[in-house]
C-alpha cells in the first residue's frame, strides 16, 4: 500500500541540499508539493521527473524575461495591452507585421516618424516589451543617454568597448529624436551606435522628423552617413493626425473626475 503521509524530513533536506548545490532553485521550491502530489496520485517516476524539470525550465524562463525587462530600461511600461490599434494612423496589417518581430530576426531597422502624440513612443516600447516576452534582448535609450555615454568614455577613448554589451541586444530602441536640440555628443553617440549595429542588430528609432531632415538637428557630416546606414535596411513608418494625448485631454480622459 502506498502511503500518503509527508516525505521524510531527511529526504526533503537532502533534496534541498542537492538542489542548492546544482542551482536548481525552482525544483527546490516546488519539490515538496510535487512529491506529495506524486505520492498521493501514484505518478509514474518519469512523470514526476517531467513535472519537476518543467517547473525548473519555466521558472528560469520567467527569471530570464524579468532580467531582460530590467536591463532594457523601458521608461513607462507601455505594452500592447493598452495599445488602441484603431486610433493609430499605422495600418493594422503593418502593426501586425511589426508585432511578428520577423524584422528583428532579419536584423532590419524601424523608423517611426511623425507629429507629437501620434503613438510613436508607445508603439516602440510595446514592440520592445513584446520582444522581451518572446525571448529577445532589448535596450532602450533616448538620444541624450547616448550623449552621456560618449562623454563618460571620451577621456580614455573606450566608447567602442562600452557599446559592446549594448550590441548584444537583438533590438536597440532610441526614442524621441528631434524632440529637443541634439548635442554634438549625442549626435556622435547615435552615429557610433548606428554604425556599430549596421546589418548585425536591429535599431528602432522614433522621431518628430523624417531622417531626411536629421541634418537640421546635427552636423551634416554626421547626419549623412548616419541616415545612410539607418535607412539601408529600414522600414519607415510615418504617423499622421492630431495628438492622441491632446484628444484624450480635451475629452476629459486624461484624469480621474474630481467629483462623481
Identify the meaning behind each predicted range.
Residues 1-17, 252-260:
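Intrinsically disordered, low-complexity and often Lys/Arg-enriched segments
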Residues 78-99:
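N-terminal pre-Walker A segment at the start of P-loop NTPase domains
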Residues 99-107:
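Phosphate-binding P-loop
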Residues 107-111, 127-130, 134-153:
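Conserved post-Walker A coupling segment in P-loop NTPases
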Amino acid at each position: 500500500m502506498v502511503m500518503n503521509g509527508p516525505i521524510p524530513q531527511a529526504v526533503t533536506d537532502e533534496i534541498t541540499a542537492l538542489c542548492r548545490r546544482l542551482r536548481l532553485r525552482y525544483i527546490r521550491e516546488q519539490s515538496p508539493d510535487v512529491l506529495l502530489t506524486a505520492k498521493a496520485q501514484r505518478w509514474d517516476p518519469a512523470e514526476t521527473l517531467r513535472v519537476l524539470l518543467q517547473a525548473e525550465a519555466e521558472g528560469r524562463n520567467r527569471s530570464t524575461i524579468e532580467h531582460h525587462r530590467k536591463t532594457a530600461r523601458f521608461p513607462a511600461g507601455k505594452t500592447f495591452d493598452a495599445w488602441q490599434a484603431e486610433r493609430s494612423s499605422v495600418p493594422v496589417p503593418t502593426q501586425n507585421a511589426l508585432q511578428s518581430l520577423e524584422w528583428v530576426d532579419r536584423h532590419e531597422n524601424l523608423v517611426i516618424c511623425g507629429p507629437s502624440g501620434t503613438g510613436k513612443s508607445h508603439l516602440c516600447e510595446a514592440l520592445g516589451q513584446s520582444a522581451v516576452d518572446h525571448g529577445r534582448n532589448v535596450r532602450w535609450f533616448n538620444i541624450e543617454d547616448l550623449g552621456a555615454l560618449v562623454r563618460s568614455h571620451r577621456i580614455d577613448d573606450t566608447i567602442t568597448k562600452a557599446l559592446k554589451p549594448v550590441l548584444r541586444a537583438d533590438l536597440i530602441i532610441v526614442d524621441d529624436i528631434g524632440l529637443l536640440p541634439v548635442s554634438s555628443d549625442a549626435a556622435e553617440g547615435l552615429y557610433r551606435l548606428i554604425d556599430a549595429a549596421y546589418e548585425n542588430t536591429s535599431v528602432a528609432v522614433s522621431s518628430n522628423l523624417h531622417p531626411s531632415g536629421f541634418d537640421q538637428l546635427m552636423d551634416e557630416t554626421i547626419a549623412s552617413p548616419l541616415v545612410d546606414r539607418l535607412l539601408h535596411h529600414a522600414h519607415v513608418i510615418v504617423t499622421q493626425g492630431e495628438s492622441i494625448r491632446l484628444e484624450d485631454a480635451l475629452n476629459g480622459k486624461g484624469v480621474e473626475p474630481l467629483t462623481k
